Amino acid sequence: RNSFPAVTTKKLAWKSVVSELLWFLEGSTDERRLAEIQFGKKRNEIVDKKTIWTANANKQGVELGYLNNETQKELGPVYGKQWRSWGRDVGGEDQIRKIILDLKNNPNSRRHIVSAWNVDKIDEMALPPCHTLFQFHVQDEKLSCQLYQRSADMFLGVPFNIASYSLLVCIFSEILNLKPGDFIWTGGDCHIYNNHFEQVKEQIQRKP
């Protein structure tokens, strides 16, 4: 409510956080479009630049048969597709537009939920959603959000995701003329990878 939950005991890739969120909100599933947003240049000028989704596009995306070249790397129906066009290849349900309208017109509803977990499309995604659904709540002119994350990389992924969804709360609050409230993070399978152990030991010795 009175601060922003950005980790301070290690570096946070803030530009990547902002770029990925804008990419999701745009509804894109092309990794090269994310690169354009992140690096601020046209895709034919940044063919050597990588994003956090490049490896998924080059491996799982290729294995699924999606277009993959220097200027386009498709990932299948990942987050942006589910957020902005759920259910159909073209003209599906725009969950972002709907939830903004619902928050504005019926703020007390308990149905302010956006889901990326489309069971029918999971096997078509280069990476099934780790942060699967989020719910908004309005009270006392404040907008709060709870995220459920099915799979949580506690060292790298979770600080990134917390910052991303907290930024989303700030964006929605501005649109709806509300104040940012609380962000609540909930994890299912929470893990630290073996190759992160030493870094985690070092990080927990630091003071925020």
Q: Which residues does each predicted region cover?
A:
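Terminal, non-catalytic protein-protein interaction segments that mediate quaternary/complex assembly
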Residues: 1-208
